[in-house]
Amino acid sequence: VNAIFNNAGVAQGGTVEGNDYADYEWVMSINFWGVVNGTKAFLPYLKSSGDGHIVNTSSIFGLFAQPGMSAYNASKFAVRGFTESLRQELDMAACGVSASCVHPGGIKTNIALTARMNDSLANVTGQDANQARQQFNDQLLRTTPEQAAKVIINGVLANKRRILIGGDAIASDLMQRLLPALYQRLVVASMGLAARFAPKGKSKPLTE
C-alpha cells in the first residue's frame, strides 16, 4: 500500500440551537472519525512500504466557518487539524510517508442534494430545506470530480501540505489568511443579504 485517500463525507445544515446532538454525532462519525480510522488502519502498511502518502479530504469549510453549518464546519476543521498534526509527525519521523489535506470548493457531486437539513436553517438562508439544497447544488457546485482528481494527484506528486480545489477555495483561503477575524462579519453581512432576497415560495422536487 502506497497511498490512501480518505474522502467519505456527508453534509448537514441547521443552527446550533436547531440541531440535535445526534446531528453532530452523525456528521463527526463519518467526516472526522472516518478519516481517523482510515489513517490509523493503513498507516503501519504505508510506513512498511517506505514510500506512502495519506490524503485526507477536509473542505472549503475547513478554512472558514459559516452560519447554519456548525456540525459540518466542526468536522472539516477537525480533519484539517488532524492532518496537519499528522503531517508534522511524519516529517519528524522521516519515514518516507507524507500527508496532504485537501480543501475542495464546490464539487459537482450529490453532497448537497443528500444533505440532512432541518427547519432551523431557514433562519439563516431564508428558505426551506429543499430550496436551500437545490440552490446550493445549482449555484455553488462548479468543479467536476475529474478536475478535482487531477488537482489532488498533482498536489500529492508535489507533496503539498494543503491542496486547494477551485477558485472558490483559493479565494476563501486568501480571505481567511488576510482577514482572519473580519471575514466573519463579511460572511454574516453577505448571507443576511442573500437570505433577504432568496427565492421564496413552494419548494420543488429536488433534481440532479
Short names for language-model regions:
Residues 7-12:
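Conserved NAD(P)H cofactor-binding loop of Rossmann-fold oxidoreductase domains
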Residues 14, 41-50:
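A short helix-coil junction within the Rossmann-fold of NAD(P)-dependent oxidoreductases
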Residues 15-16, 20-26:
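Substrate-binding pocket helix/loop in short-chain dehydrogenase/reductase
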Residues 39, 75:
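Active-site helix of classical SDR
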Residues 59:
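Residue(s) in the substrate-gating loop at a strand-loop-helix junction
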Residues 91-167:
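SDR active-site lid
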